Amino acid sequence: MELDELCLLDALVYLEGFLAFVAFVGLQMVGSSYGRYSSQWSGRRVPARPAWFLQELPSMAWPLYECIRPAAARLGNLPNRVLLAMFLIHYVQRTLVFPVLIRGGKPTLLFTFVLAFLFCTLNGYLQSRYLSQFAVYAEDWVTHPCFLTGFALWLVGMVINIHSDHILRNLRKPGETGYKIPRGGLFEYVSSANYFGELVEWCGFALASWSLQGVVFALFTLCALFTRARQHHQWYLEKFEDYPKTRKILIPFLL
C-alpha cells in the first residue's frame, strides 16, 4: 500500500511539472483572468473573499489532517515536523488571514477559482503526504547549511510577501477609486514585490526540504507568477507615464 502511494506521489511530481509548463504557456497566450484583468473575461464569478478562502483551504487542510493522524509515520522526526509546519503556516495565512484583509477585491471567475482549488488540493496532498509519510531526514538536518539557508529564505520571502500585500491594500485612501503606483519596500525595485516574496519563500522551502516535491512546487510558482508579473509590469508601463522605468518585472536588478 505504501509503495503504491509512493508511486502515486512520484507521478504527481511529474504531473505538477507538466502543469508548470502548461501554466507558463497558457498564461503567456491568454493572460491572467483575475483582479484588474477579470473584466476582460465573461463567465460566472465567485466573490473575492470566499474564493480565496475556499481555493486555498485544501493546502491548509491536508497538513492539518496529517498532524492529527496517528499513522503519520515520519512526523516523529523534527525535520519533517518543521518542514510541514512551514508549508502549513503559509496556508494558514493565505486561507484565514489574507481573505479577511481584502479590500474591495474583484470577483474571481468560477473557472479560475476551480483551477486554483484543484491545484491546492493536488499540491497540498503531495507536499503533506510526502513529508508525513515518506521523507527521510537525519535528525540533525535542521542544522545543515542547506536547511538553514532554505529556512531563512522561506522566512524572508514570507515577510516580503505579507509586507508587499499590505502596501497594495493601502494604496487607496478611504473613498478613493482607481489604481496607483505601488511605492515602498521592494516595489521600488520590481513591479510585483508580492510575487517575488512568494517565489523566494517556496525556493527556500525547496532548498530546506531538499526534495523533488519541493522543487517542482517552486518551479510551478515561478512559471505561474512570472507570466502574471510580466503582465502587471506591462500594464503599469501603459497605464502610468511616470512609472519608474528602472523597475524590473519580478527579480530585483535582474528580471
From Swiss-Prot:
| TM spans (from-to) | 6-26, 82-102, 107-127, 142-162, 205-225
What is the membrane topology listed in the Swiss-Prot or TrEMBL record?
Answer: Multi-pass membrane protein
Task: Kindly state which keywords UniProt assigns to this record, in alphabetical order.
Answer: Differentiation, Endoplasmic reticulum, Lipid metabolism, Membrane, Microsome, NADP, Oxidoreductase, Sexual differentiation, Transmembrane, Transmembrane helix
Could you tell me the EC number(s) of this protein? 1.3.1.22
Q: Name one Pfam family in it.
A: Steroid_dh
Q: Which GO terms describe its biological process?
A: androgen biosynthetic process; cell differentiation; sex differentiation
Matching entries from Gene3D superfamilies are given as:
1.20.120.1630
| GO CC terms of this entry | endoplasmic reticulum; endoplasmic reticulum membrane
Provide any one GO MF term from the record.
3-oxo-5-alpha-steroid 4-dehydrogenase (NADP+) activity
EC class (word): oxidoreductase
Cellular compartments annotated: Microsome membrane; Endoplasmic reticulum membrane
UniProt catalytic activity: a 3-oxo-5alpha-steroid + NADP(+) = a 3-oxo-Delta(4)-steroid + NADPH + H(+); 5alpha-pregnane-3,20-dione + NADP(+) = progesterone + NADPH + H(+); 17beta-hydroxy-5alpha-androstan-3-one + NADP(+) = testosterone + NADPH + H(+); androst-4-ene-3,17-dione + NADPH + H(+) = 5alpha-androstan-3,17-dione + NADP(+)
Q: What does this protein do?
A: Converts testosterone into 5-alpha-dihydrotestosterone and progesterone or corticosterone into their corresponding 5-alpha-3-oxosteroids. It plays a central role in sexual differentiation and androgen physiology.
Could you tell me which PANTHER family the record lists for this protein?
A: 3-OXO-5-ALPHA-STEROID 4-DEHYDROGENASE, 3-OXO-5-ALPHA-STEROID 4-DEHYDROGENASE 1
What family is this protein classified in? Belongs to the steroid 5-alpha reductase family.
Name the UniProt record assigns to this protein: 3-oxo-5-alpha-steroid 4-dehydrogenase 1
